[in-house]
């Protein structure tokens, strides 16, 4: 993509940190922040503009939904964070209205725009965004379990004393309570992770639980997570802009399942290029279908 224009809808902690990550990685020629809170949006824009000397970005501005209809990439991070004790259905009901309102204002949207959904519950809201837009489903997808997978890889790396980049392991399914690790497909240089002497079934279960718990630990300490997800979104944008076709676990639509959930996909300049087939163990297949039912229940 030439002269990439990236719009970020929702200039809160996640959106503004994502803009910062994009600028430091020199991924956008133009970044536009959109938020219902004009004062907050202006403050973030002015603060971020101080980093332009360290970036090739030609500009960072604030605008409206109408200003970003022709953006190459739209990152959707607007919405209300989940409150303690709030059900996923309640959260979906709240953020559904935000998604519907914003996408109505975005019409007519450029037929080549790619939309990255970040707002939770991301699987259900990604499907909603697909259903209310005229774009191909391959151009609208969510961050899904990408951050969960990177957290898992970090934990495995520290346990085995290898680089995180050398680990091929994914968290799949719902971005939520029913997510699971596909241990049967996890390996390092072709060697199954489960075959390492240190990786007992108890250790694998501990790593999986630590992966699931990490977000809650962060929220308990500081109220929200945003650095990790911002880094994930910038990685996704890089794969799109440079047509890298990176294989990432993202929330995409699977016609045979009828929902959006995370499986490994190749991400390029046209969006989702293909889903990478996995040969899951029987119990992992069962966990995948449990995720499907959980998502459908929202």
Protein language model regions, located:
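Beta1/beta-strand and adjacent pyrophosphate-binding region of the FAD-binding site
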Residues: 4-8
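N-terminal Rossmann-fold NAD(P) dinucleotide-binding loop
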Residues: 15-16
